[in-house]
Amino acid sequence: MKSINRALVAAALLWAGGAIAEDQDAGSGLLPRALAHIDDYVTADIAKGVVPGATITIVRHGKVAYRRAWGERDPTNRAPMTDDAIFRIYSMSKPITTVAAMMLVEEGRLGLQEPVAKYIPQFANVKVGVERNGDNGQRVLDLVDPRQPMTIQDLMRHTSGITYGFFGDSLVRKVYTDSHITRGDFDNAEFADRIAKLPLAYQPGTTWDYSHSTDVLGRVIEVVSAKSLYAFEKERILDPLGMRDTSFYVKDQSKWPRIAEPLVNDRAIGRDAEFGDPRVPRRWESGGGGMVSTAADYARFLQMLLSSGTLDEHHYLSPKSIAAMTSNQIGPAAGVVPGPFYLPGPGFGFGLGFAVRLEPGVAPQLGSVGEYFWSGAGGTTFWVDPKEDLFVVFMMQSPAQRLRYRIALHNMVYGALKN
């Protein structure tokens, strides 16, 4: 009940009508003079032309401790950054999709242990790519059967064996790159069919490897719910939370001026990939990286998670589901090893849709054991700290600076804690 009351206070004070007061709350336990270091850090980068602009919202004990918008929303027309700016959140779509899938798990319509092929039959024939040296010394890719089926849990924790094509130079990744699976206009059903024809990079359930797994999970949601991914998420998550500006594309032209843009020399989000235009709708609703949102919208989502799955007396998820999602699901006990491109970083494990901090040290940033986070390729990031009853959502469109900011923001926010 205490967490629900905090959530109600948060909703009333912070997000009614989309307005959030910018002044720090005196009871937040965060020192204003220390939080000012964030101002200095961001404004210095803006002055140097390193980032165009950014927004941040820090909430503690259900109240805004700090909120700012700096710089320019669109550097091409010098439009100032605003609180309601719309950002491409890329992989911050993944937690929303995973929450949607967990709703189906709670209803008994989906099981973590179930094979993906139960819902997408094409995955019954998937193969695993294994490299070896050929007679001429060249690398050769052999295809072998999986030792165990790919499961729904594997999709949620990135242990499916599916991969992305932009990390490393393995032969499987080359197959992904050469197949151009994201080219053209297609829906989630066709995407799942395309990716099921490609070899897996690892045996399912053995290795954490960042991937299109959440995109496939989005298709599973469609099959189980008999609705499009967006229709299901809109009905069950976005509309009840009041996330009016969160979607896969911005179809409403009146919102187009609010879309945040990167600097012209900072548009690359990966190998041979640049910022997409959310004004141009496609049939693909990428549950792994296709959404746009605002800081205020995403704050509603995070407050729901921090409030144990209930916000404004509306129940979304059980506290037990959130506990499972934010507990480590990899490591020796699970028989899962981190792959060579382990994005959660040192000191972190991975749950279902979230990286989870396991150690007070090891990681290069300050924080709490049990905090969970994820980020987007375009420069957005968030984390939730249940121990400190705190969450942070930071949004910018600057992929080149995203890792530096993720670490620096942690250090400055926790450096401001006084109790």
Question: For the regions a protein language model found, what residue spans apply to each?
Answer:
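N-terminal signal peptide c-region/cleavage motif recognized by signal peptidases
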Residues: 16-18
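Boundary of Sec targeting at the N-terminus
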Residues: 22-24
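Short, well-ordered beta-strand elements
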Residues: 382-384, 389-398
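Bacterial N-terminal signal peptides that target proteins for export
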Residues: 1-8
